[in-house]
Amino acid sequence: MTKDKEPRKDHTSGRKNFGGEPPVVCSFCGRTSHEVNSMVAGPNAFICDRCILSSVEILRKEISAIRHPEKTSEPAFQPRLKSPVNIKESLDQYVIGQERAKKSLSVAVYNHYKRIDAHEWTAEDEVEIEKSNILLIGPTGTGKTLLAQTLANLLEVPFTIADATSLTEAGYVGDDVETILARLLHASDFNLERAERGIIYVDEIDKIARKSANVSITRDVSGEGVQQALLKILEGSVVGVPPKGGRKHPEQQLININTKNILFICGGAFEGLDKIIARRVSKSSMGFGSKVKDKQTGYDPEILKLVTQDDLHEYGLIPEFIGRLPVMSALDPLDASALRNILVEPKNALVKQYKRLFEMDGVELEFTDEALDKVVEIAIERGTGARALRSVLENVMIDIMFELPTLKDVQKCIITSETIDKISGPVYEKKDGKERLTA
């Protein structure tokens, strides 16, 4: 009898495995005894401590909902934790290029939500994993905002975008940093638990760099002062937020938000940062990449990948602020080939969107290769990357979409390079196939 009981004690010990026996596997979640603190054995089945606690929480909520139906609310959403490979594959469907940035983001996001999941099971004497906020560096229109937005959609977590240029220190004209959290709360439909697991993208973060390396007697209310104000919410703290946004006032009721599990992604063009890096890095150590400059941006597309915290400090970010953004990734400028692919390849590519709109009117939309090349050419001239593609197409398509619903018997609309240049309108094909009309 003693020998029969002894293995069961080993099985329920969780992390230990005496006698060289294979680890026990939880029948519910599949975790092994090495991954949990304890394992309870039953007839032909095992259950780990994590599944037990999860079951208790589920039952507690169900009982509470029965006893207090008026207090029943949507349960906190736990993002489905996908592997970095799966996250990147999902990003690939919407974002063209930027392979390095997508890998960095995938790993950072995976570790962030794994950290949240593991926090409840971490003993006080175990290693606590710090938050992996992210800094994206790259020219305008390279996909910084799109990457953050796509990640939030993929994980189905609340998401909001804030413009750093609108932020000022408390007491000055402009937005407090707390307004960022208020927007996230709105995005979560005031579900506090969901908001506390959301993602915030702070754009134009380079614009709050310290204006001068010299200490001034005048306050830098939109530069270093904002960096100091952002520190508190970046590192994780409980912040009182006005539910309707705007400035705080003494008589206003505040909602306390814990930012410990909110992922912050900051992005900026950081114009001139490449020159700071170039001064630090000798030509010999920069290698072959140092001689190749991007035609649109005028800087070496590889040089930003060499950025260090010291470079960012020289640029104007304070060390404490840089330290709150441990994951840094530089995005590549988009060349003509990448812009052309962005037009047609992503799951929600602009060309696909317009084709779907025309399809709703029973008309097939076609872009000639020359037309797409012309769109890319104009976008490159504007110098705003992928952002220019939509404005170029919208400028052309607005008149066509205005008159299309009133045209009869049209089955196909062909956009040519002349259409993009506004030399002539599109070519319409009628349903009988015999008549071609040029607008």
From Swiss-Prot:
Q: Which PROSITE patterns match?
A: CLPX_ZB
Positions of ATP binding:
P139, T140, G141, T142, G143, K144, T145, L146
Q: Give the UniProt keywords, A-Z.
A: ATP-binding, Chaperone, Metal-binding, Nucleotide-binding, Zinc
Record carries keyword Membrane: no
List this protein's GO terms for biological process.
cell division; proteolysis involved in protein catabolic process
| Pfam (any one) | AAA_2
Q: Which residues bind Zn(2+)?
A: C26, C29, C48, C51
Q: Where is the ClpX-type ZB domain?
A: 13-67
Looking up SUPFAM superfamilies in the UniProt record yields: Glucocorticoid receptor-like (DNA-binding domain), P-loop containing nucleoside triphosphate hydrolases
Task: Return the GO cellular component terms, semicolon-separated.
Answer: HslUV protease complex
Instruction: State the Gene Ontology terms under molecular function.
Output: ATP binding; ATP hydrolysis activity; ATP-dependent protein folding chaperone; protein dimerization activity; unfolded protein binding; zinc ion binding
Q: How does it assemble?
A: Component of the ClpX-ClpP complex. Forms a hexameric ring that, in the presence of ATP, binds to fourteen ClpP subunits assembled into a disk-like structure with a central cavity, resembling the structure of eukaryotic proteasomes.
Q: Which family does it belong to?
A: Belongs to the ClpX chaperone family.
Q: Its biological function?
A: ATP-dependent specificity component of the Clp protease. It directs the protease to specific substrates. Can perform chaperone functions in the absence of ClpP.
Name of this chain's protein: ATP-dependent Clp protease ATP-binding subunit ClpX
Name of the gene:
clpX
